[in-house]
Amino acid sequence: MSELKIKAAKAAIAYIEDDMVIGVGTGSTVNFFIKELAAIKHKIEACVASSKATEALLRAEGIPVIDLNSVQDLPIYVDGADEVNERGEMIKGGGGALTREKIVANVATQFICIVDESKVVKRLGEFPVAVEVIPMARSFVARQIVKLGGDPEYREGFITDNGNIILDVFNLNFSTPMALEDSLNVIPGVVENGVFAKRLADKVLVASASGVNNLK
């Protein structure tokens, strides 16, 4: 599996141009992308990290990291996915960085999703949806999610970079992913959720034994 993730990471490097500021996601496939990016770090201006973990990895490779607030133009954002379909709709947030990932993805002009073939699905929903929640609202939000048909589980011992908690939600109805994304986000106490149906991936680079293909 690591070989496929490396393939996908290498394919994303082809989209990096000189003097770019690059948004960098979070997760195991992205970690391989950071390794590849380190080889051309002299060509890029800097990176915007979607998590403290990614920022630490970038700095360890000697890659400059800047704050999103200091960026007016972000040409590209590279990140993985827990699930992705052919339309570029995704479930993200297995690593708990979904809120910052969604923010950076929306700032970026182009979102490149890098995955191995196991992450490609016809219908989203087998992987649970991470929902970032203000701690005091955990029980209330969980009850509201049950009303939507979901089965929330508290992610024990995990605190997000924003100081919040995560509910992992199973068995949600993905017949209309965009409506689901909205339905979760309007619950008071919800910060963000891991359904990416509004900000789609512009390119989905899928690595398999036969090579890397763009799903879109």
From Swiss-Prot:
Record-linked Gene3D superfamilies: 3.30.70.260, 3.40.50.1360
EC nos: 5.3.1.6
Keywords recorded for this protein, A-Z: Isomerase
GO molecular function: ribose-5-phosphate isomerase activity
Any GO BP: D-ribose metabolic process
Metabolic or biological pathway, per its Swiss-Prot or TrEMBL entry: Carbohydrate degradation; pentose phosphate pathway; D-ribose 5-phosphate from D-ribulose 5-phosphate (non-oxidative stage): step 1/1
Broad class of enzyme this protein falls into: isomerase
Catalytic site: E101 (proton acceptor)
CC annotations in GO: cytosol
InterPro entries named in the record: NagB/RpiA_transferase-like, Ribose5P_isomerase_typA_subgr, Ribose5P_isomerase_type_A
Catalysed conversion reaction: aldehydo-D-ribose 5-phosphate = D-ribulose 5-phosphate
Keyword Nucleotide-binding: no
Positions contributing to substrate binding: T26, G27, S28, T29, D79, G80, A81, D82, K92, G93, G94, G95, K119
Function: Catalyzes the reversible conversion of ribose-5-phosphate to ribulose 5-phosphate.
Record note on quaternary structure: Homodimer.
Family: Belongs to the ribose 5-phosphate isomerase family.
Name recorded for this polypeptide: Ribose-5-phosphate isomerase A
Native organism: Legionella pneumophila (strain Lens)
